[in-house]
Amino acid sequence: MGASGKWVKSIIGLKKLEKDEIEKGNGKNKKWKLWRTTSVDSWKGFRGKHRSDSDGVDSSTVYSAAVATVLRAPPKDFKAVREEWAAIRIQTAFRGFLARRALRALKGIVRLQALVRGRQVRKQAAVTLRCMQALVRVQARVRARRVRMTVEGQAVQKLLDEHRTKSDLLKEVEEGWCDRKGTVDDIKSKLQQRQEGAFKRERALAYALAQKQWRSTTSSNLKTNSSISYLKSQEFDKNSWGWSWLERWMAARPWETRLMDTVDTAATPPPLPHKHLKSPETADVVQVRRNNVTTRVSAKPPPHMLSSSPGYEFNESSGSSSICTSTTPVSGKTGLVSDNSSSQAKKHKPSYMSLTESTKAKRRTNRGLRQSMDEFQFMKNSGMFTGELKTSPSSDPFVSFSKPLGVPTRFEKPRG
């Protein structure tokens, strides 16, 4: 920048010198000289040219101009021509130097401007790129939101969710990896055995609680205790009972046993003399109806009915019981009907519903034959036994017939 300033000052100084010379030439004291006029004309010829073209002035043109001046000049002015020629050469060299210096200054200015403008352009370009990136991001977010709202976007989201669930399942499987030795079947069998063992333990606990409750109830029932001691004294064989599992289950239902006890207590008449007692065939008979099957249970009267005096003791070994089952379909709900209650109900029946004498006789004969056959089969299949009776696998696990009739019991599973 300093060189350019000096160059401008030098140009201004040259212009001032030219103006002074022109003013002096127009004055009165002006003297005409050949070399001055020629130098002024040559200066005027060179002044109209551009400063940047001064370096390209051809030496031949300068030489031809000098030769023409010499030829026009007279011989006596040869010395002045030589001086003028030398001045032209000096001015030409000086002007070339100034032009080169100005060119260098211009080149520096151009370079500086290029640097400044380049930096500004780069800044502007960076800002523009940042703005474009921000716009692109905003557009991408808007498009992604639109895609999510469409059906296709929802399907893609479902696929992504399924993939995530699969990965979650794989993670769960990896977390729940089993390090046990053996095949899958062995592990499954072990787990199943554990479950079965837990189930059996629960059943055993339930059975123990039921037995405990049953023992507490049987301890307060004298009739039940006497019947239990009676059956244990007989010691029949476990597997020689002549009953089917259905008959035993029906005869030992606890929910019906309570009703039987209530019916017996309600229908039992006061103690009678020994001569007024009924025969064994006409003993108390209880009919049990369950699932359209009638079961008749006949037993000896209780001890207080057999005793003729307060001091009489009942012999448990002399007692006997028989059970007979008839498969006559019976409609209606499960209930208990005793002969005593039926005799009372007959009083309220109309005459056309009562049985005839022949029908009654047939029923008596059939009843006696059936009871005798049942007793014979029972005595034939009976034997000595110890402990409680166990059922077959097909029998109900909650019924046991080691206890007397009308006693709520449970069955145990068969051992080995």
From Swiss-Prot:
IQ domain segment(s): 83-111, 112-134, 135-158
Transmembrane regions listed in the UniProt entry: none
Domain of life (superkingdom): Eukaryota
Motif residue range(s): Nuclear localization signal: 14-21
UniProt KW Cytoplasm keyword: yes
Region described as Calmodulin-binding: 116-146
One record GO biological process: cytokinesis, division site positioning
The keyword NAD is assigned to this record: no
Keywords assigned: Calmodulin-binding, Cell membrane, Cytoplasm, Cytoskeleton, Membrane, Nucleus, Repeat
GO cellular component: nuclear body; nucleus; phragmoplast; plasma membrane; preprophase band
Ranges annotated as biased composition (Low complexity): 317-328
GO MF, one annotated term: calmodulin binding
PROSITE patterns for this protein: IQ
Ranges of biased composition (kind: Polar residues): 388-397
Gene3D superfamilies for this protein: 1.20.5.190
Region feature Disordered, mapped onto this chain: 294-367, 388-416
Record's subcellular location: Nucleus; Nucleus, Nuclear body; Cytoplasm, Cytoskeleton; Cell membrane
Quaternary structure and interacting proteins, as annotated: Binds to multiple calmodulin (CaM) in the presence of Ca(2+) and CaM-like proteins.
Family: Belongs to the IQD family.
Purpose of the protein: May be involved in cooperative interactions with calmodulins or calmodulin-like proteins. Recruits calmodulin proteins to microtubules, thus being a potential scaffold in cellular signaling and trafficking. May associate with nucleic acids and regulate gene expression at the transcriptional or post-transcriptional level.
Protein name per UniProt: Protein IQ-DOMAIN 6
Organism: Arabidopsis thaliana (Mouse-ear cress)
Gene: IQD6
